């Protein structure tokens, strides 16, 4: 029951079916900061974040299987296609966010989370295209984010300018 309630909240408050994708978050703010009343209002962050949507895709695909709800699978795959089509560059991989357009390409978290969502979509559908896309992102991680001393950088050189670095 709790899973159904969480899905209901996400779909009612954070899902935009016209895209289709999930908004960033809902913030709760006190109506009057000078008093300690319980009155508050909410603001929806309508920016679409790749990593958060990828996590939602994985969760909805799991929920579809566990709850026997094909509609959740369809919704997850729709979000996956939107994020892949609108938040990706062939050279730089996944962009971190999308509002008026895609912004902040090449962050490790976005490549990794979207890669996991694509692998999960492959398991849910058997469609090889999802596995091929995950491999594309893995190549970007290795080529653009690998540290020659070991491990990976969380962002590439070209992405640092977005964050104000030289």
Language-model segments: residues:
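Glycan-recognition and catalytic cores of secretory/periplasmic carbohydrate-active enzymes
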Residues: 1-166
